[in-house]
Amino acid sequence: MRRREFLGVLGGAAAAWPLAALAQQADRMRRIGVLMYLASDDAEGQARLAAFAHALEQLGWSDGRNLRIDTRWAKADDIGKHAAELAALAPDVLLAGTGTATVAPLLQATRTVPIVFVSVVDPVGAGFVASLAQPGGNATGFTIYEYSMSGKWLELLKEMAPSVTRAAVL
């Protein structure tokens, strides 16, 4: 009987151990640094940041409860300073909130903190990542334009509008 009790306690402890680890992680305040190349009163920038915070909240991450979002609004002359400030805070991740203009200063500020970018036209051409499939380094993100898809886009255009003989891209 003692052997069964011991095995029961051991099994219960083994089953509960991962739950204790998860509980400890939830107590740790996570930190996100956001660099925006916009004025702090820019309506579009505020809307983007609000949407980001709302999406995080839906996933259980609430600013002030288990997450801290540090945002810096930068202009051309002080973007490097703001990127360095954010990197010095040692966040869990940095968000380059307004595309190409914010990625380069963040990469100059840190090569260890993960950087996530949004709406960068050509991250490979800009030297932010090695490739889209395997970015390497500490930067990754979303591109709004993939040059290798140009042929497919023209093929689809021809299929949708066979009478079109010329197309221009701006």
Question: What does each of the following model-derived ranges do?
Answer:
Residues 1-170:
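Short hydrophobic alpha-helices and adjacent helix-cap/hinge residues
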